[in-house]
Swiss-Prot record:
In-chain residues carrying the UniProt-annotated modification N6-acetyllysine: K605
Protein name, UniProt field: Acetyl-coenzyme A synthetase 2
Cofactor: Mg(2+)
EC number: 6.2.1.1
Entry's Gene Ontology cellular component terms: cytosol
Residues the entry annotates as binding ATP: G383, E384, P385, D407, T408, W409, W410, Q411, T412, D496, R511, R522
Reaction(s) catalysed (UniProt annotation): acetate + ATP + CoA = acetyl-CoA + AMP + diphosphate
List of residues binding Mg(2+): V533, H535, V538
Taxonomy of the source species: Bacteria, Pseudomonadati, Pseudomonadota, Gammaproteobacteria, Pseudomonadales
HAMAP family on file: Ac_CoA_synth
Species this chain originates from: Pseudomonas putida (strain ATCC 47054 / DSM 6125 / CFBP 8728 / NCIMB 11950 / KT2440)
Pfam families named in the record: ACAS_N, AMP-binding, AMP-binding_C
Length: 644
C-alpha cells in the first residue's frame, strides 16, 4: 500500500475557513440522524414560491426520490432575479475567449436582460413548459443564457457538448424528442474552428420533428440556411422584450437531461429535477469551495458536462458568485494559458481535472514561472481520481503550498459533490477524496453485498437518498432502476471501487470493472497507474486486465512517456521495480505497451473500455467511439498491441 502523506492545512486556512472540524462533525451528524430538519434548514439557501408539504419521500430499493414535494420555485429566479437589488452591477459571468484578446464581463443585470430576451424569443417560437430544447454550443455566454432561459419558462434543456459528432447529436435529439435546437455558426477552440451549424444540419437530416434552430453568430463563417426553421439568435432576441416572468415550477418538475455514456448500448439521458438538484449545487458550491463574496471562481469544464452545469452555471450563480467561463484549451496559445488567465482575472478558486494537470505537469515548471498566481486561495480536482504525484505538483507548484486542494468525487447521476475534504476542517492526503459531504452516507460492500466495517476495500455505495439524486433515465425509467438500484438492493450503486483507511477516509480506486484479480489479489487499476506515474519519465499510464492462463487475469499497462524520453527495456525494468516497491510484486504488469497517446473522451477521460478490448484482443466490436477526441489513437495502439 502507498505511504500516506498528510498535509496539515495551514493555520491561516483553518482560521479563515467558514467551518471548523467541530462544525463539520456536528452538521454531518445532524444531516444523517435528522435529515428532514437538516435539509429544511439548508433549503433556506433558495427562494421558494410555495413551501413543501414533505421534505423527502425516498426508497432506494426502487430508486424513488421525491424532495420538497408540493413546493414551487424557479431556477433562473434563484440564479438571477434575487441578486438584482444587492448586486445587479456585479459581474456574474466573466468570459475568456479562445483568443487571449477576447474577454467580457456580464453583470447580473445584463444576464437578466439577455435571459429574459431569449426566453421571450423561445416562447414566440412556441416553446412551452415541459418541452425539451437541445443546446449544442461553444463555451460562450449564450450557452449559459440558453440554459437559464429554458429554466425561466419551464423548458427542459439537454446540453450536448460541442465536440460531439453529428451522429451523437442526432441520437440525443431523437432520444429526448427535442423540437428546438440552439447552436452557433461555429465554435473556436485552440485556434481551430468547429463547424457546429454544419453538424446540426447533418444531425437534423434524421430529425424531422425539429422545427426551430436558433443560431448564435460566433465567427461570422458561412453556414447553410433552412428558411422557416433557422433563425439568427440576435434577430430573434432583438425585439423580444427585457422582461419575462419566471414560470413557477414544482420541486420535482424535470430541470434538465444530460447524457452520459453507458458502457453498453445507447447513452443514458440522466434526468435531474428542479428543487433537489438546485439545492445540491447551491449548497455544495458554497460549502466545498468556502466561497466568499466578490471572489472569482473558475471551473475549467465545459457546460456540456455535469461539472459545467453544477459549477459554472447553477451553483455559482445561485450563490451570487462571479463565475469564469473559458472557451479555450490549456495549451493555446501556449502551455501557460491557464496560469495567464488566473493572473489576468485574479482568479481565487480554480477547479480542474487531473488529466489537464498531468498534461501541464509534463511540460515542467517553466510555463508556471512566467505567472504569479498569487490571487489563488483554493484549488479543486474533479472528474477522476487524482494520482498523488499530480496532487503534489498541483499543491506545491501551482498553489505554492498555500492553497488547500479539494479532491472531489461525484457523478453526473449525483448532481453535486459527494466526497471531498472541506477547507480548514482536516489534513489533506494526496489522492484521497476523504470525507462525505453533508447528507451523504457512503458504505463499502464486498462481492457478496455484505457491509465492510472499518478499514477495507470494496464497492462504494450510498445508503440514503440526497436531494441531487438522479430521478430517471429519460424515456427508460427501468434502465435507471436496473443500473443504479438493482445491483445492491437498498443502496445506490456507484460503479466505483473505494478503500477506507484507518482514519475513515475514502480513496476512490477506479471503476469496479477497473479492478483486476491476479492470482486472488484484487488490484485497483488506479493504484498501479499511480505507481507508474511516480517515475519521472512517465507522463501518463492506463492499466487494464486481460485473460492470463496462469493467474486468471494479468496486468496490462499502456504508458505514455514525457516529451523527449525514448522508452526502452531499462525504463521498463525500472517501472516494474517501482510497482513492486509501491504495491507488491503481485501487481507488476505482465505487459507494458508504450503509447504515444491514450484514447480519451473530449472531456479528457481515458476510455479504459477500449483499452480493455485491445488488451484482450477483442477487436471486432470496440463499442461507441463517438465520444473520442482523436479516434486515430486507437488504431495505433491496436497495431502495436502486445497480446496478439
Amino acid at each position: 500500500m502507498f505511504d500516506i502523506r498528510k498535509y496539515p492545512q495551514a493555520l491561516a486556512v483553518s482560521q479563515s475557513a467558514a467551518l471548523t472540524p467541530e462544525d463539520y462533525r456536528r452538521l454531518y451528524r445532524q444531516s444523517v440522524e435528522d435529515p428532514d430538519t437538516f435539509w429544511a434548514e439548508q433549503a433556506k439557501r433558495l427562494d421558494w414560491i410555495k413551501p413543501w408539504s414533505s421534505v423527502q419521500q425516498c426508497d432506494l430499493h426502487t430508486g424513488k426520490a421525491r424532495w420538497f414535494d408540493g413546493a414551487q420555485l424557479n431556477v433562473s429566479y434563484n440564479c438571477i432575479d434575487r441578486h438584482l437589488a444587492q448586486r445587479g452591477e456585479q459581474t456574474a459571468l466573466l468570459w475568456e475567449g479562445d483568443d487571449p484578446k477576447d474577454s467580457k464581463a456580464i453583470t447580473y443585470r445584463e444576464l437578466h436582460r439577455q435571459v429574459c430576451r431569449l426566453a421571450n424569443a423561445m416562447k414566440a417560437r412556441g416553446v412551452k413548459k415541459g418541452d425539451r430544447v437541445s443546446i449544442y454550443m461553444p463555451m460562450i455566454p449564450e450557452a449559459a443564457f440558453a440554459m437559464l432561459a429554458c429554466t425561466r419558462i419551464g423548458a427542459i434543456h439537454s446540453v450536448v457538448f460541442g465536440g460531439f459528432s453529428p451522429d451523437a447529436l442526432r441520437d440525443r435529439i431523437l432520444d429526448a424528442d427535442c423540437r428546438t435546437v440552439i447552436t452557433a455558426d461555429e465554435g473556436v477552440r485552440g485556434g481551430k474552428r468547429i463547424p457546429l451549424k454544419q453538424n446540426v444540419d447533418k444531425a437534423l437530416a434524421s430529425c424531422p420533428a425539429v422545427s426551430s434552430v436558433l443560431v448564435v453568430r460566433r465567427t461570422g463563417g458561412d453556414v447553410a440556411w433552412t428558411e422557416g426553421r433557422d433563425l439568427w439568435y440576435h434577430e430573434a432576441t432583438k425585439d423580444a422584450g427585457d422582461d419575462c416572468p419566471p414560470e413557477p415550477m414544482e420541486a420535482e418538475d424535470p430541470l434538465f437531461i444530460l447524457y452520459t455514456s453507458g458502457s453498453t448500448g445507447k447513452p443514458k439521458g440522466v434526468l435531474h429535477t428542479t428543487g433537489g438538484y438546485l439545492l445540491q449545487a447551491t449548497m455544495t458550491f458554497k460549502v466545498v469551495f468556502d466561497y466568499r463574496d466578490g471572489e472569482v471562481f473558475w471551473c475549467t469544464a465545459d457546460v456540456g458536462w455535469v461539472t459545467g452545469h453544477s459549477y459554472i452555471v447553477y451553483g455559482p450563480l445561485a450563490n451570487g458568485a462571479i463565475s469564469l467561463m473559458f472557451e479555450g484549451v490549456p495549451n493555446y496559445p501556449d502551455t501557460s494559458r491557464f496560469w495567464q488567465v488566473v493572473d489576468k482575472h485574479q482568479v481565487n478558486i480554480f477547479y480542474t481535472a487531473p488529466t489537464a494537470l498531468r498534461a501541464l505537469m509534463r511540460e515542467g515548471s517553466a510555463p508556471l514561472q512566467s505567472t504569479s498566481r498569487k490571487s489563488l486561495r483554493l484549488l479543486g480536482s474533479v472528474g477522476e481520481p487524482i494520482n498523488p504525484e499530480a496532487w503534489e505538483w498541483y499543491f506545491e507548484e501551482v498553489g505554492q503550498k498555500r492553497c488547500p486542494i479539494v479532491d472531489t468525487w461525484w457523478q453526473t447521476e449525483t448532481g453535486g459533490i459527494m466526497l471531498t475534504p472541506l477547507p480548514g476542517t482536516q489534513s489533506l492526503k494526496p489522492g484521497c477524496a476523504t470525507q462525505p459531504m453533508f447528507g451523504v452516507q457512503p458504505v463499502l460492500l464486498d462481492e457478496k453485498g455484505k457491509l465492510i466495517e472499518g478499514p477495507g476495500a470494496g464497492v462504494l455505495a450510498i445508503k440514503a437518498s440526497w436531494p441531487g439524486q438522479i430521478r430517471s433515465v429519460y424515456g427508460d425509467h427501468q434502465r435507471m432502476v436496473d443500473t443504479y438500484f438493482k445491483p445492491l438492493p437498498g443502496y445506490y450503486f456507484t460503479g466505483d471501487g473505494a478503500r477506507r483507511d484507518a482514519d475513515g477516509d475514502y480513496w476512490i480506486t477506479g471503476r469496479i470493472d477497473d479492478v483486476i484479480n491476479v492470482s486472488g489479489h484484487r488490484i485497483g487499476t488506479a493504484e498501479v497507474e499511480s505507481a507508474l506515474v511516480l517515475h519521472d519519465s512517465v507522463a501518463e499510464a492506463a492499466v487494464v486486465g486481460y485473460p492470463h492462463d496462469l493467474k486468471g487475469q494479468g496486468v496490462y499497462a499502456f504508458v505514455t512517456t514525457m516529451n523527449g524520453v525514448t522508452p526502452d527495456d531499462t525504463l521498463k525494468a525500472e517501472l516494474l521495480a517501482l510497482v513492486s516497491k509501491e504495491i507488491g510484486s503481485f501487481a507488476k504488469p505482465e505487459l507494458i505497451q508504450w503509447a504515444p497517446a491514450l484514447p480519451k473522451t473530449r472531456s479528457g477521460k481515458i476510455m479504459r473500455r477500449i483499452l480493455r478490448k485491445i488488451a484482450c484482443n477483442e477487436l471486432e466490436n470496440l463499442g461507441d467511439t463517438s465520444t473520442l477526441a482523436d479516434p486515430s489513437v486507437v488504431q495505433g495502439l491496436i497495431d502495436k498491441r502486445l497480446n496478439q
